[in-house]
Amino acid sequence: MLRAFAARSCAARGFSRPAAGLLRAPSLRLLSADAQRRGTYEAPTEEKQLAKLQPRIAELYRKGRYKEALAVGEECHALALAAFGKQHPAVASMCNNLALMHKSLGDTDAAAALYKEALDCYRVVVGEEHASTATAACNLALLIRDTDAARLQEAQALLEGALQTRRVLLGEGHLTVAATMGHLASVVKLDGADGRERAKVLLEQALAASTVHWAKPGESAEADLQRASLLHSTGLLHKEAGELSAAEEAWAQAAEIRLGWLGEKHPLSAASQRDLQALREMMGGAE
């Protein structure tokens, strides 16, 4: 998941390490070959303002000041429209960032509309099989998953397409591919017994890839924390199937990883510890 400033998260880039979910705008300039060669390009006023404002959105988002970030994002969106017109990657990036702010503020209807606008724009200007399109599809799919159970098939289709694109662009063993498999598993598991079985396979494949392709445990926070996320999802699947011992094993591993990298006060570490403790109490009561 302002990743178009970036990722995963949420992808295109406005600062070196964008905040999760933020998409940084792609290169904004559309230079003639002659202007590039002679170095005579002068960015329009809107583009200069946009370049200055983008980092501010990320800063406000990281601080949880979503209303202020939304206001700056709306200004950026207007500047991008004025500079490039409606069908441009920079405009799609701004739509993604506005959607994230609305989502953070609890306005999921506005967020869904903006995520859809970003996705439609990317499909037109960069094509279906592009990294930014895959990111936009994931953003919309995850919002649908969390807010509209009647549209789970749509969410699944979006994630299937994003996974296919990312496999081609990044390779089977990439962290982002594994994350997408985890997202897809979280949707397909809701589709009865067959869906749960497919979710299990997806998570097993992602964890197997982590063993072969990723940094060894303890060497990379990014890899380890993605592994912890997959383990937590695996444990939840086992718990829902009544396989409590398997759930405990997966959750214990996830909790240990998160504690080691994030510390006990981090929300993810605390949540893992609470879930694991509650599960063990449940298992004790069942004995």
Show where each model-derived region lies.
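Intrinsic-disorder-linked linear interaction elements in eukaryotic regulatory proteins
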Residues: 1-287
